[in-house]
Amino acid sequence: EDVPACFFVTKTYIRDNPELATRMKVDGHQVGNHTVTHPSMPSVSYEELIQEITGCAEYMKEITGYDMDPYLRPPMGEYSQRTLKITQDLGYKTIFWSMAYMDYDVNNQPGASYVTAHFEKYHHNGAIILMHNVSSSNAEALETVIKNLKAEGYRFASLNEL
């Protein structure tokens, strides 16, 4: 459907899926930082946070040969003024989302019809949509959701365009 995406990945994801992490970049998508171990960022020390962010980026480069894009999504959306400043000082823009649902539990998926209805009800101009790539419901519904939103006149843009 020619829709850009930014995949926020952890070091563990890159380690377990090196081919997919590489393919994301090869296919023209953005790959953003989601830290090494997915901690609550406000709960870690300055030094630990630096390592969480730089360690993930360095591993991405080592394994795939590609640099991460300069975006970071805080694990669980947890942040503080301190973590926002550290992230900015490292050259990242912190990205949050405006649309999401509980799609990350692979053992409790709501189904494609729920996903489609959710997006039909809650979509809006400028939405940043959070979808976890482990979700079978997302995989089943994504083509329909994209076609429906395009039919309503929406255009999908990369984070660089926002």
Language model: regions and residue ranges:
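Terminal accessory/targeting
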Residues: 1-5, 125-162
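Active-site beta->alpha N-cap acidic-glycine motif
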Residues: 1-44, 48-69, 155, 161
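Active-site-proximal beta-strand/loop segments in catalytic clefts of secreted hydrolases
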Residues: 8-12, 35-36, 73-77, 97-100, ...
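Generic structural signal for hydrophobic
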Residues: 21-24, 87, 122, 149
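Short glycine/serine/threonine-biased micro-segments
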Residues: 30, 75, 124
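Extended hydrophobic/Leu-rich segments
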Residues: 30-33, 105, 118, 146
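Alpha-helical scaffold elements lining the catalytic groove of polysaccharide deacetylases
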Residues: 39-64, 78-125, 138-141
